[in-house]
Curated annotation (Swiss-Prot):
NCBIfam families: GAPDH-II_archae, PRK04207.1. This is Glyceraldehyde-3-phosphate dehydrogenase. Transmembrane segments: none annotated. One of its GO terms (cellular component) is cytoplasm. It comes from the Archaea. Belongs to the glyceraldehyde-3-phosphate dehydrogenase family. Pathway: Carbohydrate degradation; glycolysis; pyruvate from D-glyceraldehyde 3-phosphate: step 1/5.
Length: 340
């Protein structure tokens, strides 16, 4: 059983820790925090060994009466791999200043740039490329969702051009500092947005074939994508079948009352999901259409959780624990209780 250190027990880190803890071939050897907040206290309550991410701040945890095992320097060399959950730009610095120094493999998250790691990971597309590598970037929630859907489409036809409009949530539910509250913001105002090139970092054959634009709207629950994908030839039934066969994608029906991101979140709550996480992306079945070989569909992405199962598969790939990506996906899905 391999040992995983989660460096940064925040929005992504705490979910990764819980996901690792559910696997039978890996374990959490520790988690880190930069400050003694409620998440640090919760980590200890849940049984995780807590370490100070910044050694000079260890005393703050002691002063706050939060049990602390030491600093990251005391645990990192016991780790087979580190999952970095730090804010963007910090992950890159951690690779250069911490992980390479201690000769430990690491996964950084999608806030970093593709050039900051050896490759970009998605369980369906780049598992084999990342097999045995030392420093891998796990792409963002939006890119992860797009890669899954484009995988389904690519399995049945050739993609000539993909156009995507991303409607992004303004902030996570616990974020009181980010907006907007009463505006719609082109972000970026230029086209393409960074999402297209990010998809290409995972799927090189789509270079020159994907165009994305993005806006931010005042909601916290989920992102939404509208896809228009030109193909060499396809039917609606074939698209429906491909989506059904692709892991970590579910179809939802507006006709059954799931007609908004709010209803998708309510559905996730009713599934009994911790933190109402929906690791699967949700495609509205009624939105799927094919006109003149061009596929149209709309999908929703739970930005806090869709990348979590990918982190687990990435651990297996980098540590050469399972050669077959589909077997890893199925193993992860079973452990996490995913729908498919």
């Amino acid at each position: 059983m391999v040992g995983v250190l989660v460096n940064g027990y925040g929005s992504i880190g705490k979910r990764v820790a819980d996901a690792v803890a559910k696997q039978d071939d890996m374990k959490v050897i520790g988690v880190t925090k930069t400050k003694p907040d409620f998440e640090a206290r919760m980590a200890v309550t849940k049984g995780y060994k807590l370490f100070a991410a910044i050694p000079e701040k260890k005393h703050l945890f002691e002063e706050a009466n939060i049990p602390i095992e030491g600093t990251i320097e005391d645990i990192i060399e016991d780790a087979d791999i580190v999952v970095d959950g730090a804010p963007k730009k910090i992950g890159k610095a951690n690779v250069e200043n911490v992980y390479k120094k201690h000769n430990v493999k690491a996964i950084i998250q999608g806030g970093e740039k593709a050039k900051d790691a050896e490759d970009s990971f998605n369980s369906l597309w780049s598992y084999n490329r990342c097999y045995g590598k030392d420093y891998i970037r796990l792409v963002s929630c939006n890119t992860t969702g797009l890669c899954r859907t484009l995988y389904a489409i690519d399995s049945i036809t050739d993609i000539l051009k993909a156009r995507v409009v991303l409607v992004r949530r303004a902030a996570d539910p616990n974020d009181i500092k980010t907006g907007p509250i009463n505006a719609i913001i082109p972000d970026p105002v230029t086209v393409p947005s960074h999402h297209g090139p990010d998809v290409v970092s995972v799927i090189p054959k789509l270079d020159g074939k994907i165009m994305t634009s993005a806006i931010i709207v005042p909601t916290t629950l989920m992102h939404m994508h509208s896809l228009m994908v030109e193909t060499t030839g396809v039917t609606k039934d074939a698209v429906l079948d491909a989506i059904e066969k692709t892991p970590r994608i579910i179809k939802v029906k507006a006709s059954e009352g799931i007609d908004s991101t709010a209803k998708i979140i309510e559905y996730s709550r009713d599934l009994g999901r911790l933190r109402y996480d929906l690791n699967e992306i949700a495609i509205w079945e009624e939105s799927i259409n094919v006109v003149d070989n061009e596929i149209y569909l709309m999908q929703a992405i739970h930005q806090e959780s869709d990348v979590i199962p990918e982190n687990i598969d990435c651990i297996r790939a980098m540590l050469e624990m399972e050669e077959d990506n589909i077997k890893s996906i199925e193993k992860t899905n079973r452990a996490l209780g995913l729908l498919k």
